[in-house]
UniProtKB/Swiss-Prot annotation:
Organism: Burkholderia cenocepacia (strain HI2424)
Positions where N5-methylglutamine occurs in the chain: Q235
PANTHER family in the cross-refs: LD18447P
Post-translational modification: Methylated by PrmC. Methylation increases the termination efficiency of RF1.
Name of the molecule in the record: Peptide chain release factor 1
GO molecular function, one term: translation release factor activity, codon specific
A Pfam family matched in the record: PCRF
Similarity comment text for this entry: Belongs to the prokaryotic/mitochondrial release factor family.
Keyword set, alphabetical order: Cytoplasm, Methylation, Protein biosynthesis
Organism lineage string: Bacteria, Pseudomonadati, Pseudomonadota, Betaproteobacteria, Burkholderiales
Intracellular or extracellular location(s): Cytoplasm
GO cellular component, one term: cytoplasm
Summary of the function given for this chain in its UniProt record: Peptide chain release factor 1 directs the termination of translation in response to the peptide chain termination codons UAG and UAA.
Length: 360
């Protein structure tokens, strides 16, 4: 283990001991905000220090076994103990490296998932609907909550554009690598000659901004228009101007919401999506220079980058960022994304570990 890493782990062990002392004091709950902060830090440090204690025990076992090598009658036993201790230390060190990786501050946030039909006309819109169903089925498996924010349906079904809010533990950390271009290759239902068509959609995954002032939006920078909602909804939907369009003048970002009969609720939803889009824009501008100097395999979130191909005739899905091909497309389209997401997370961790190694 590198000296810098061991020094860091020693510091965390000392800090955990301090937290144990602070949390054992009688008046610890006098300041509830401080108490919550301390318990959260304790919960984060506990597993790391526990793993480090196991690593130190393995190192101690190796040292003890080394001393037995001089005794011929104990040599075989000692060599087995040394080998076992070193294997344990290597495994624990890898786990500790992952635990020490810098955390994405957005990982625990809820998200807005936006899917837009791209090239391919009606077939692209139909595929946007298929992608939405895939993500909704995945969210259902995670027991996350889903709320429709905005939708623009196409004539033959599917969506020209759809935005949903997904709320649940780890929503952003699990879905953040979905941003980018998704290409589909299949025979459309309208194709009479049986020819395979290629079309595409773009997906954007945006962390939800905090309720209180995380993204400052000056009301003077907003243009808010109301209009009559279109599409399904019966006669009532055409009687009032319940649909809302919010334009953020400095950035040109436009959000429309018309899914609710209440103009107030539509405006509230539109402002939430707008805040997330502004936050997302700021994030990508902030990381543009970094991305230019060190091209990351995944996590760039560039909407124009084609990240994945879904080939229906061959029953395969290929993620181009990590060269992963899975021949289980039906299960994937039904929301079974664990293997795919796990591979992306593992690759991302490997990139972070490599960058930390370069820094050392």
């Amino acid at each position: 283990m590198k000296t810098s890493m061991q020094r860091k782990l020693d510091q965390l062990s000392t800090r955990l001991a301090e937290l144990n002392d602070l949390l054992s004091r009688e008046n610890v709950t006098a300041d509830l905000d401080q108490y919550r902060k301390l318990t959260r830090e304790h919960a984060e440090l506990g597993p790391v220090v526990e793993q480090y204690a196991l690593w130190r025990q393995s190192r101690s076992d190796e040292t003890a076994a080394q001393e037995l090598l001089a005794d011929p009658s104990m040599r075989d036993f000692a060599e087995d103990e040394i080998r076992s201790a070193r294997e344990g230390m290597a495994r624990l060190e890898t786990e500790l490296q992952k635990m020490l990786l810098p955390k994405d501050p957005n990982d625990d946030r809820n998200i807005f998932l936006e899917i837009r039909a791209g090239t391919g006309g009606d077939e692209s819109a139909l595929f946007a609907g298929d992608l939405l169903r895939m993500y909704l089925r995945f969210a259902e498996r995670q027991r996350w909550q889903v709320e429709m924010m905005s939708e623009s349906a196409s004539d033959l079904g599917g969506y020209k554009e759809v935005i949903v809010r997904i709320a649940g533990q780890g929503a952003y950390s699990r879905l953040k690598f979905e941003s980018g271009g998704h290409r589909v290759q299949r025979v459309p239902a309208t194709e009479t000659q049986g020819r395979i068509h290629t079309s595409a959609c773009t997906v954007a995954v945006m962390p939800e901004a905090d309720e209180i002032g995380e993204v400052e939006i000056n009301p003077a920078d907003l243009r808010i228009d109301t209009f009559r909602a279109s599409g399904a909804g019966g006669q009532h939907i055409n009687k009032t101007d319940s649909a809302v369009r919010v334009t953020h003048i400095p950035t040109g970002i436009v959000v429309e919401c018309q899914d609710d009969r209440s103009q107030h609720k539509n405006k509230d939803r539109a402002l939430k999506v707008l805040a997330a889009r502004i936050k997302d824009k700021q994030y990508h501008e902030q990381h543009a220079k970094e991305a230019a100097t060190r091209k990351s395999l995944i996590g760039s979130g560039d909407r124009s980058e084609r990240i994945r191909t879904y080939n229906f005739p061959q029953g395969r899905m290929t993620d181009h960022r990590i060269n992963l091909t899975l021949y289980r497309l039906e299960a994937i389209m039904d929301g079974d994304l664990d293997e795919l997401i796990g591979a992306l997370v593992t690759e991302h961790q490997a990139e972070l570990l490599a960058s930390l190694g370069e820094a050392d």
